Each structure stands twice: as C-alpha cells, then as structure tokens.
C-alpha cells in the first residue's frame, strides 16, 4: 500500500512489505524538490540506516551526465590526428640550404714543383747524346701528362715521350725524350748541365 501527499514543494512516499522473510518492515522517502536534495531513511527490525545529503539530480538523471573521460580522449585523439595550421607549419622539418663550397683542384703543382732538378750522371749524359733525352728528378705526385706540359711550357720544346721511374729511396725520375727537331745537347747547355752554357 502506497500513499503520496499532493504537495508541490515536498513529496513523501511510504511502502509496506507484507513478506515475513524480509528484514525491512517499512521504508519511507522524502524529497525536497527546490533544493534537489533528499533524505532516505530505512527502518528495519534489526538496524536503522540513514543516508544524508543525497543528491536528487544524480538519482533522477544519471544517464544525462556527459562522460568527461571519453570525451577528453576523443578530443585529444582529434587534435593529434588533425593539428592546427600553426602546429603543422612548425612541425614540418626545416631544410636549410647551405652555400656550396668552392671545389679546389686536388693537385696544385707548378713547374718548379714538378721539375725539381736535372740528373747529371754519366748515364744521363750518355742518354742526352744517344737518345736525345733529358733526365729530371720530378715530384712524386706528378704524372706523365703534367711532366710533358711542364717541359713544353718552361723550355718551349715538344716532347715525344715521357717515361717515369720511382727509385727505392722514394724519389721519382723522369726520362724526357724530345722530338728530332730539337737537340737535347743544346737544351742541356742552356740548363747548365754541360759547361759553357749561357
């Protein structure tokens, strides 16, 4: 049996259970609508249970509360997937264009570095007379093309062939054979290999 008082400001309800096996003999509810708070008292045959400051809004509409944790996770995932334009501009890697360095030639050898000194031995003098060739000690880094260009530019003669040899002591010797139109003996006098040269 249930009775309800028709009051707009306060509502009270009482319920009676006729089941003898139940421990609760009577239960009464009192609601205060303007304050949205209610006091629930349960009268039992053994114990008296009282709960104070019960939130009526939580009891009536528990499903209308937004799930803040899930909404926050969704918002964070959305921000991570679609960043703003400012963040996108700052997050892109910046590639700086460096100024190109000047490439210098690896071998910088002038004529005086390539042709170090003429070789004045009996075998070298014999080669001057017999094979129309000169012998020079040259730089180890100089190749045949560089030696040919150095002789042509420095002495003004045409070179027919260049042979090179590296000695056991690490120095490099060059056999420079001139064309037939040039005389190696006259060039040797100009250099100072033979006495009486200019």
Curated annotation (Swiss-Prot):
GO terms for biological process: translation. Residues 1-76 form a transit peptide. It is found in: Plastid, Chloroplast. InterPro entries: Nucleotide-bd_a/b_plait_sf, Ribosomal_uL23-like, Ribosomal_uL23/eL15/eS24_sf. Keywords: Chloroplast, Plastid, Ribonucleoprotein, Ribosomal protein, RNA-binding, rRNA-binding, Transit peptide. SUPFAM superfamilies: Ribosomal proteins S24e, L23 and L15e. Transmembrane segments: none annotated. Component of the chloroplast large ribosomal subunit (LSU). Mature 70S chloroplast ribosomes of higher plants consist of a small (30S) and a large (50S) subunit. The 30S small subunit contains 1 molecule of ribosomal RNA (16S rRNA) and 24 different proteins. The 50S large subunit contains 3 rRNA molecules (23S, 5S and 4.5S rRNA) and 33 different proteins. Two forms of the protein exist; they have the same N-terminal sequence and approximately the same molecular weight. PANTHER family: 60S RIBOSOMAL PROTEIN L23A. This is Large ribosomal subunit protein uL23c. The lineage of its organism: Eukaryota, Viridiplantae, Streptophyta, Embryophyta, Tracheophyta.
């Amino acid at each position: 049996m249930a009775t309800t008082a028709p009051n707009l400001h306060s509502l009270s309800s009482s319920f009676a259970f006729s089941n003898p096996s139940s421990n609760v003999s009577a239960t009464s509810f009192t609601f205060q609508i303007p304050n949205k708070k209610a006091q629930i008292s349960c009268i039992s045959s053994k114990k008296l249970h009282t709960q104070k400051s019960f939130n009526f809004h939580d009891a009536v509409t528990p499903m209308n509360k937004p799930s803040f944790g899930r909404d926050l996770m969704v918002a964070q995932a959305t921000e991570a997937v679609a960043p703003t334009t400012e963040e996108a501009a700052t997050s892109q890697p910046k590639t700086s264009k460096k100024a190109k360095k000047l490439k210098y030639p690896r071998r910088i050898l002038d004529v005086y570095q390539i042709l170090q000194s003429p070789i004045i031995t009996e075998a070298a003098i014999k080669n001057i007379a017999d094979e129309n060739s000169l012998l020079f000690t040259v730089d180890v880094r100089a190749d045949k093309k560089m030696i040919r260009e150095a002789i042509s530019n420095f002495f003004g003669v045409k070179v027919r062939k260049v042979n090179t040899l590296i000695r056991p002591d690490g120095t490099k010797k060059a056999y420079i054979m001139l064309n037939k139109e040039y005389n190696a003996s006259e060039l040797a006098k100009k250099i100072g290999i033979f006495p009486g040269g200019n």
